[in-house]
Amino acid sequence: MYGIEYTTILTFLISIILLNYILKSTTQMMDYIIYRFLLITVTLFALTKAQNYGINLPITGSMDTAYANSTKEETFMTSTLCLYYPVEASNQINDGEWKDTLSQMFLTKGWPTGSVYFKEYTNIVDFSVDPQLYCDYNLVLMKYDQNLELDMSELADLILNEWLCNPMDITLYYYQQTGESNKWISMGSSCTVKVCPLNTQTLGIGCQTTQCGSFEIVAENEKLAIVDVVDGINHKINLTTTTCTIRNCKKLGPRENVAVIQVGGSNILDITADPTTNPQIERIMRVNWKEWWKVFYTIVDYINQIVQVMSKRSRSLNSAGFYYRV
C-alpha cells in the first residue's frame, strides 16, 4: 500500500516538473515569436514611411525639382559643373593643356579640380538632337550666328525647360494642342513637318487630307523643331518618319540647373517673351566675343554669379530620359 502511495506521489511530482518544463519552453517560444513579430513590424513600418522607388506612379508634375543635398556638409561631396562649347573654341585655342589651365582657374573660384567637365559639340543643330546634361550645373556656350538664330532659340527653349512627352502615331490619329504649354517637338537628322487643320467634319481647312502637297509646312529640313499650331483644332500631320520622330509635349516648368551663354551677337536671345515660360527668370546670358580665351576667362570670373541664378539638381539628364517619360 505504501509502495502505491509513493508511486502516486512520485508520478505527481514528475508531472509537475514536466509541466513546468513545458510551460517554460512554451514561454520562451512565445517570447521568440513575439519579439520576431515586433522586429518585423517595426522594420516594415519604417520601410512604409520611406520613399518607395519600386512603384511606378503616374507623373503629375515636374520630376526635375531641386533637392536639398543632405550630405552637403561632407567634404567629399562637391557640385559638378559641365561646360558645353563648340569645337570651334578648341580649334582656335589650339593648346593641348587649355582645359587643365581653366581647371586651375576654376579652383581659385572654389571649384575643386575634377568637378568641372568640358564637353565639346560639333554644332548647335547636332547638339540639339541629343543634349546630354549630366552635371549638377550645366552651362551651354552658343556662339551667335544670324543664320542659326531660330535653331539657337529652339535649343534654348528645349534645354531651359522640362518637357513631358508622349509618342505620336500620326498614321492613325489626328492631334490637337490643348493650350500654350502644349507643343509638338520633332527631332532627327532631317525633319519636315506638314499639317492640315481640320473642321468639325474632319475636312481639311485650306488643304485636302488626301494630298500631302496641300498641307502647310511648319518645319522644313530641321533637326529640331518645336511646332506650335492653333489650339483646340484637330490636325492631320505628315512627317518624314524615316529620318525624324515627333512627340506630343507639355512644358512643365523651368529646368533650373541649365543656363545658356550666348557668345557674341548684337542682341540676346529672349525666350522669356514666350507666355509659356513661367516664371519669367532669365537664364540666358551674353558675353562679348573677340577670342575664345577671353570668353572662358569671363566665364571663370563670373561663374559663381552665374550659378546663383540656377538650382542644383540631384539627378542626371539626357534627351532620351525626358523625351520618353510618359
Swiss-Prot record:
Residues glycosylated per entry: 69, 238
Residue numbers spanned by region CNP motif: 165-167
Position of the signal peptide: 1-50
Location in the cell: Virion; Host endoplasmic reticulum lumen
Location, primary (coarse class): virion
Keyword presence, Membrane: no
Keywords, comma-separated and alphabetical: Calcium, Capsid protein, Disulfide bond, Glycoprotein, Host endoplasmic reticulum, Host-virus interaction, Metal-binding, Outer capsid protein, Signal, T=13 icosahedral capsid protein, Virion
Keyword Membrane attached: no
Gene Ontology cellular component terms for the protein in this record: host cell endoplasmic reticulum lumen; T=13 icosahedral viral capsid; viral outer capsid
PTM annotation, UniProt: N-glycosylated.
Region (GPR motif): 253-255
Function: Calcium-binding protein that interacts with rotavirus cell receptors once the initial attachment by VP4 has been achieved. Rotavirus attachment and entry into the host cell probably involves multiple sequential contacts between the outer capsid proteins VP4 and VP7, and the cell receptors. Following entry into the host cell, low intracellular or intravesicular Ca(2+) concentration probably causes the calcium-stabilized VP7 trimers to dissociate from the virion. This step is probably necessary for the membrane-disrupting entry step and the release of VP4, which is locked onto the virion by VP7.
Note: Some rotavirus strains are neuraminidase-sensitive and require sialic acid to attach to the cell surface. Some rotavirus strains are integrin-dependent. Some rotavirus strains depend on ganglioside for their entry into the host cell. Hsp70 also seems to be involved in the entry of some strains. In group A rotaviruses, VP7 defines the G serotype.
Family to which this protein belongs: Belongs to the rotavirus VP7 family.
The protein's name in its UniProt record: Outer capsid glycoprotein VP7
Organism expressing this protein natively: Rotavirus A (isolate RVA/Cow/Argentina/T449/1992/G1P[X]) (RV-A)
